[in-house]
Amino acid sequence: NKALRVLANPFMDLDKITAAPSPSPNRWSDKVPSREMTVEEIQEFITAFGKTAKLLKDAGVDGVEIHAVHEGYLLDQFTLKYVNQRTDEYGGSFENRYRFAVEIVKEIKKVCGQDFPVSLRYSVESKTKGFREGALPGESFTEAGRDMAESEKAAKYLQDAGYDMLNCDNGTYDAWYWAHPPIYMPENCNLEDAEHIRRFVDIPVVCAGRMEPGTAARSISEGKIDGAGFARQFLADQEWVSKMMDGREEDIRPCILCHNGCFNMCHYKGVPNDQDLSDSLHLARCAVNAETMQTDKHHIVKTASPKKEHIIGGGIGGMEAARVLKLRGHEPVIHEK
């Protein structure tokens, strides 16, 4: 919708200087360093979060989730000592570093009411050695960001500030593969840490990040977490939950954790965020599901005149052709030597 771009351009403009808790390198471009945010800008953000939440509530939304103390995003950067070098009320001490996130939830509760649910996306541990240097599973390293001891304190502190749920994984932009686990990360790589942090709060804790459904279900049934988060699998197969409930696991089209399609909203043809929203070919597509974000182009319609179709070769292309032809109502026959 091009009209929406008049209201808000949801992409980074790398020709403009970006802002951060303290002067720092830009994660996306070495040519444009980040400057320090002013207190006035921080207050403007806090007010904007409250106004936006109120608009959503008035529109009938039941609650909001703040993408905040998570994956090295802005509010998370404020909490991390290796990024936040401020000496004012938003830097230094534990309370000051978490002040931004605390004041946001308090503002939302003030304008929307104490009973309006506010969830927080939360990285239990940063798993980060330093700028652009993350840690791998099982690696011995010195944590530059939030370690477990601080996280235990922070989770309780954020709960007491007003957050109603923690939606957990791990990592920062410097260790992004914990929050968006690719194929080389182990299944359930964030579960142990989420289960641990659950013991320090009285609010629901959700875990995300390459969750195996059976393991997630057991953890929930045992009371170790309260929910599991899935995203990429829904791009691969929108009906996968229904298929599981019907005992049709073998029919589920699995996410292959490749990031070749779903990350293109951020990296468009190798250039971060340089993209036309109308170009559905590169808008959160999926390598294993052609219909994802391209339903107008690839929507399967039943034929009015079924035919017997012969396909020479039973490779990946031949099998996909047979599958689609069958869904369209034809009778495909594969010939393979």
Report residues per predicted region.
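Flavin-dependent oxidoreductase catalytic cores
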Residues: 1-312, 316-332
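Conserved acidic E/D residue at the C-terminus of a beta-strand in Rossmann-like folds
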Residues: 334-337
